[in-house]
Amino acid sequence: MAVPKKRTSKSKKKTRKAVWTAKADKAAVEAFSRARSVLTGRSSSFYYAANNDISK
């Protein structure tokens, strides 16, 4: 017969959520930084076609 699991404490739940949120915030900041460097032309590690026209 199925037995319900024990409830997770509020502190553990908040800690896990805080870690997840911090990781997401860090990834967003890094992505924004990379995008900004590409758009300003200061990027030295990204290679991309500047004028990529799909209709050709």
UniProtKB/Swiss-Prot annotation:
Transmembrane segments: none annotated. Keywords: Chloroplast, Plastid, Ribonucleoprotein, Ribosomal protein. GO terms for cellular component: chloroplast; large ribosomal subunit. The keyword Chloroplast applies. SUPFAM superfamilies: Zn-binding ribosomal proteins. It is found in: Plastid, Chloroplast. GO terms for biological process: translation. PANTHER family: 50S RIBOSOMAL PROTEIN L32, CHLOROPLASTIC (PTHR36083), LARGE RIBOSOMAL SUBUNIT PROTEIN BL32C (PTHR36083:SF1). Belongs to the bacterial ribosomal protein bL32 family. This is Large ribosomal subunit protein bL32c. It comes from Huperzia lucidula.
